[in-house]
Structure formats: C-alpha cells, structure tokens
Amino acid sequence: MELLRKVSGYLTFDNICTALSVIGAVYFVINRFILHRAPVPSSAFKHVPKDLLDECIKQLKKQEKRVYEDYELPIALRRDLQLRPDDEEVLKRLLCSICDHMGIDGSFIKLIISDTPVPERAGAISTDLAFTTIWLEMRPPYVTDSIIAVLAHEVMHLHLYYEGIRRQDNWENEILTDTAAVYCGFGDYMYKGYAVNQGEMALSYRKVGYIRQEDVKYILDTIGKQE
C-alpha cells in the first residue's frame, strides 16, 4: 500500500506529459537518425488490401484503350520547379505537361493554387465536361515529386471520367485513381511523391496520396509480371 501511494504521487499530469515527451523524442531520434526513416507508424495510413489493388489493375487492363509510356518531366520544367515551386505559371506548365502525356488538352483547365492548409487534402478537381478546375494545396517544404504526384492524381480523375472508368465506393475510386496514375506511366513520381516527408516543423511529417510507397511498388511489380 505504501508503494502504491509513492507511485501514485509521481503520476501527476505534468509527470505523465514529460514521460510521453521523452518517449516520443527517443522514438523520433531512433527512427530519424539511426533507422533513417520517417518516425510515423504505418498504422497512420489506411491499409489498402492487395485484393483491391489487383481488382483495380484488372479493371484498368480491361477498360483502358491506350498503352502509356513512362512519363518524363522535361528538364527545363524540372529546373523551374526547383527554383520556383509555388509559381502559378510553372505549375500550369506542369499540369499541361501531365495532361499532354494523357492526351488531354490542359490549356482549358483552371488551376487554383491555395496556401491555406486543408486537412486530409492535397488537391481536388471539379468538372462538368465543359469546364474543369483543379485545386492544388501548396505549403512548404515543397517537394517536386509530391507536386507531380498530386497533379497526376487529379488529372487521372479527369481521364477516368472521360473514359467512364470508376468504382462505386468513393474510397475505392480514389485507390483506382492512384493505381491508374501508376498504370499510365507516373509510377516513379508516385513512388517518390507518396513518401512521408518532413513538414514545416522539426517533428512534423506530411504524406499525400491514398496509397503507400509499398503499394506503388506492388502495382509496378504486378504490371511488370503481366506484360
């Protein structure tokens, strides 16, 4: 009983917060500087069943009308993105380059750049065939491959809309869209862009996309085996 009273005396709110902070700091140091990986547990991202990825690949192989080569970002455009990653004119050129790869006229698409953080969103699209708008959420640090991956995802929404390729469930449709981006030649950019990246604060991290890097690799490997 005496031991219990002594222990309970240490279990104050401040002491608990201090202990949690120390544990968090140790976890961060081990993952960031020893294991060289982002200290974010995989449980932070919704697991995508391999069966669903297989279904999406099968659906695309059946319904896609074209075979796409790997997308290559023009050298001059990459340089401009590295120098001016939040420049609206540069980002519109990137959007048009991605659209051109997909056989879409990107000049008619209105691109809106926003620096106001929106939880759980890096981009969005609205279209009615006659008019299309893409929103791109931009906040530092700017990662070129992540910007490409987000825009590729939104353009893929438009492509799948034109082709009538979709899934009924909204979340599954987002997985289909990410899978299509890999399928249509953006695999390398999706893999790099969907990594967990350090955020604005020292201990903050960000990730875009609905699938993880291991999912991108699985899609690429599966497509490669089927060719």
What label would you give each PLM region?
Residues M1-L11:
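Short, strongly hydrophobic alpha-helical membrane anchors
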Residues F13-H36:
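N-terminal signal-anchor transmembrane alpha helix of single-pass membrane proteins
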Residues I30-L81:
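Hydrophobic or amphipathic, alpha-helical segments that drive membrane association/targeting
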Residues Q63-L129, P140-D145:
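Auxiliary, metal-adjacent structural segments of Zn-dependent hydrolase domains
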Residues L91, I148, N173, T177:
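Hydrophobic (often cysteine-bearing) scaffold residues that line and stabilize catalytic clefts
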Residues W135-L151, W171-E172:
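Short pre-active-site segment immediately N-terminal to the catalytic Zn-binding motif
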Residues A149-E163:
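Active-site recognition of the HExxH zinc-binding catalytic motif
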Residues I165-E227:
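Metalloprotease/metallohydrolase-associated module, dominated by Zn2+-dependent proteases
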